[in-house]
């Protein structure tokens, strides 16, 4: 009976240890996935920021060109 108790405790202990290891690996994997998601979000944010800056610059140049063309048209009409 004593051997049976020791065997049962050993099996339960080893099961608990393996469960603990699995939970730890699962947590590490979740942390890695979260970190990858954060990195992707940062990359997307940087891409959008760059695109919006370029779009703003293009819009500014287009606006200046349109104003210049309008001014030329007005000045030609007054001559």
From Swiss-Prot:
<dbReference type="Pfam" id="PF12121">
    <property type="entry name" value="DD_K"/>
</dbReference>
<feature type="signal peptide">
    <location>
        <begin position="1"/>
        <end position="22"/>
    </location>
</feature>
<feature type="propeptide">
    <location>
        <begin position="23"/>
        <end position="45"/>
    </location>
</feature>
<keyword id="KW-0295">Fungicide</keyword>
<keyword id="KW-0732">Signal</keyword>
<comment type="function">
    <text>Antimicrobial activity with potent activity against Gram-positive and Gram-negative bacteria, fungi and protozoa. Also stimulates the microbicidal activity of polymorphonuclear leukocytes. Probably acts by disturbing membrane functions with its amphipathic structure. Does not show cytotoxicity on lymphocytes or KB cells. Does not show hemolytic activity. In vitro, shows spermicidal, antiviral, and anti-leishmanial activities.</text>
</comment>
<dbReference type="GO" id="GO:0045087">
    <property type="term" value="P:innate immune response"/>
</dbReference>
<dbReference type="GO" id="GO:0031640">
    <property type="term" value="P:killing of cells of another organism"/>
</dbReference>
<keyword id="KW-0930">Antiviral protein</keyword>
<dbReference type="Pfam" id="PF03032">
    <property type="entry name" value="FSAP_sig_propep"/>
</dbReference>
<keyword id="KW-0929">Antimicrobial</keyword>
<dbReference type="InterPro" id="IPR016322">
    <property type="entry name" value="FSAP"/>
</dbReference>
<dbReference type="GO" id="GO:0005576">
    <property type="term" value="C:extracellular region"/>
</dbReference>
<keyword id="KW-0878">Amphibian defense peptide</keyword>
<keyword id="KW-0391">Immunity</keyword>
<dbReference type="InterPro" id="IPR004275">
    <property type="entry name" value="Frog_antimicrobial_propeptide"/>
</dbReference>
<keyword id="KW-0044">Antibiotic</keyword>
<dbReference type="InterPro" id="IPR022731">
    <property type="entry name" value="Dermaseptin_dom"/>
</dbReference>
<keyword id="KW-0964">Secreted</keyword>
<dbReference type="GO" id="GO:0042742">
    <property type="term" value="P:defense response to bacterium"/>
</dbReference>
<dbReference type="GO" id="GO:0050688">
    <property type="term" value="P:regulation of defense response to virus"/>
</dbReference>
<comment type="similarity">
    <text>Belongs to the frog skin active peptide (FSAP) family. Dermaseptin subfamily.</text>
</comment>
<dbReference type="GO" id="GO:0050832">
    <property type="term" value="P:defense response to fungus"/>
</dbReference>
<keyword id="KW-0399">Innate immunity</keyword>
<protein>
    <recommendedName>
        <fullName>Dermaseptin-S1</fullName>
    </recommendedName>
</protein>
């Amino acid at each position: 009976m004593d051997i049976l108790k020791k065997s049962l405790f050993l099996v339960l202990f080893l099961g608990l240890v393996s469960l603990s290891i699995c939970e730890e690996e699962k947590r590490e994997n979740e942390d890695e996935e979260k970190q990858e998601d954060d990195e992707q979000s940062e990359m997307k944010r940087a891409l959008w920021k760059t695109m919006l800056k370029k779009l703003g610059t293009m819009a500014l140049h287009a606006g200046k060109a349109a104003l210049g063309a309008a001014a030329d048209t007005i000045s030609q009409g007054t001559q």
